[in-house]
Structure formats: structure tokens, C-alpha cells
Amino acid sequence: MIKLLVSFTILFVLSSARPQEIDSNQAAIANTEANEAPVIVNNDASMGNAVDFSFPTNVQVMNCLKKAKYQVVFLRGFVPTGNGAFDSNCVGNIRNAYSAGLGIETYMTPQPISSWQGYQQLDLLYNGLNNNGITIRSVWIQVTSPANWPNNPTANVNFINSIISRAQQYGLSVGIYTNQYDWSQITGNSANINSNVMLWYWNVLGGGTSGETKPTFADFRAFGPFKKASVKQYAQVETVCNLVVNRDVYAVGIPAAAPKTEVNMADGEKIVVGGFVGN
């Protein structure tokens, strides 16, 4: 009886939590098996399929994702733990994805209440990748979960712009992962964001396949500084290739060709990530 009550309580918490606030490491009970990447039904050859995740995984899983018709993986490179830190798990994930011939994008979950400024957190990500032989061409900044941000829209906008400005100094393209609600709560729906920033928005009804929305941009509505979208996250907390992921659709950019054969990292080859998403 106690176990039944505990299970019911966990399910209630998962069903009532906002999806991006669920820690996927703790959400196995809500996982559902997803099919392979959906066929793009709008006859638009400039659209592609992707997944995003933060777990460490291996090249076999990356090969499986490739066979399941996903073209790009979004991998976390910065965690908000403490003052914020480089996510060392991304190094192996990037190398494995590169070996599998997948396109790679990197996102950061910054720590807005850190003693470090936004630009300093971006430096940690940039240097962490560069020191591991990985060149970064674009970065995505996660701006979600308003409870984790100060109740100060002006300070939050300044923090975000600090990251963007530093990234642009490095010559990186920049995108923001958010949605209309999160952006409004965190920034007061500010449009005072540095120019040429892409949008990756999320719209789901809940975790698992039953919470999916359509893998198109048809539901996008302009907000803040964002007049169009580059990526949509339409599914969260699903299992693909025995890995808990979120699923996305994106506008295709013009990247360098991905390798067709497994990479021998002992050769010292420089991996380049980013640039797979168009604006």
C-alpha cells in the first residue's frame, strides 16, 4: 500500500510539473518509447530532425540516432551547478556524435544567480571545448524555469546580453532556448536583446508521446525580440535508442560536411560544432 501511494505521488508530481523543470535523470517513470524521427510533411527540404539531451552516452547510441533519421543532436556544455561549470560530459558526447556523422549543436544552462557574470560563464564553455580540441561556431542559451532566475527583469536581460556579447566577440552565432511564457516571466517580454539572435522555442503539453505537439513551426507566434523561429522542441522526456531525450525540428543551416567514417581522435583532428541551424 505504501509503495502504491509513493508511485501515485511521483506520477502526480511529474504530471503537474512544467515539463522543462523535470530532471530527466529522475523521470524514468514517465518515459515513453518514441518512434524514429518524423517525416517532414510540409515538403520543405530545409527542415530537419534533432534530439537534445545531457546524459553521457556512447557511439553506439549516436549511431542508433543516426539510423533513426535524426540529423542533429543538441548537447549541453554548461551546467548551473554552484556558480556554473563546464559540463565535461559533453566532450565524449561530441566526439561520439561526430564519429557517428551527426551534426552537433551546443547549449548552455547558465547560472543567473552566480558570482560570475554571464560573459565569464560563456568563457568557461568556450575554453572548455577549445581545450579539448573542439571548435565551437554557435551556442544556445537556455532561458527557462523562471523560479531559477532573480525577480529582476532588467538584471536578467543584462545577464543574457552579457553572454550574447561575449559569444559574438568570439564570432559565434547565438540562439536562445525559451518560450513566450518563460521569456515574459524572466525578462518582462523584453525586446532589448542584441541583434541576430536565433530562437529555439518549446511547446509541449506534457512529458512523453502523449504530450507532443506537431513537429512544425505552425504554432509559433512572435514575442519579445523574436519574429521567427529556428528550432522547435515539440516533445519532452521520451526514449529513443534507449536514451531519454527531447525531440526537435529545426531549420537547416549550411554546416561543414560531417565525417562519413569513425574519427580517430588520436590523430588530433579538430572537431567543429555548430552552424547546423539556419536563421
Curated annotation (Swiss-Prot):
<dbReference type="InterPro" id="IPR051595">
    <property type="entry name" value="GH25_Enzymes"/>
</dbReference>
<feature type="domain" description="Ch-type lysozyme">
    <location>
        <begin position="47"/>
        <end position="265"/>
    </location>
</feature>
<dbReference type="GO" id="GO:0050829">
    <property type="term" value="P:defense response to Gram-negative bacterium"/>
</dbReference>
<protein>
    <recommendedName>
        <fullName>Lysozyme-like protein 2</fullName>
    </recommendedName>
</protein>
<dbReference type="GO" id="GO:0009253">
    <property type="term" value="P:peptidoglycan catabolic process"/>
</dbReference>
<keyword id="KW-0399">Innate immunity</keyword>
<keyword id="KW-0929">Antimicrobial</keyword>
<dbReference type="GO" id="GO:0045087">
    <property type="term" value="P:innate immune response"/>
</dbReference>
<dbReference type="GO" id="GO:0050830">
    <property type="term" value="P:defense response to Gram-positive bacterium"/>
</dbReference>
<dbReference type="GO" id="GO:0003796">
    <property type="term" value="F:lysozyme activity"/>
</dbReference>
<feature type="signal peptide">
    <location>
        <begin position="1"/>
        <end position="19"/>
    </location>
</feature>
<dbReference type="GO" id="GO:0007165">
    <property type="term" value="P:signal transduction"/>
</dbReference>
<dbReference type="InterPro" id="IPR017853">
    <property type="entry name" value="Glycoside_hydrolase_SF"/>
</dbReference>
<keyword id="KW-0732">Signal</keyword>
<keyword id="KW-0391">Immunity</keyword>
<dbReference type="InterPro" id="IPR002053">
    <property type="entry name" value="Glyco_hydro_25"/>
</dbReference>
<dbReference type="GO" id="GO:0016998">
    <property type="term" value="P:cell wall macromolecule catabolic process"/>
</dbReference>
<comment type="similarity">
    <text>Belongs to the glycosyl hydrolase 25 family.</text>
</comment>
<comment type="function">
    <text>Involved in resistance to Gram-positive bacteria P.aeruginosa or B.thuringiensis infection.</text>
</comment>
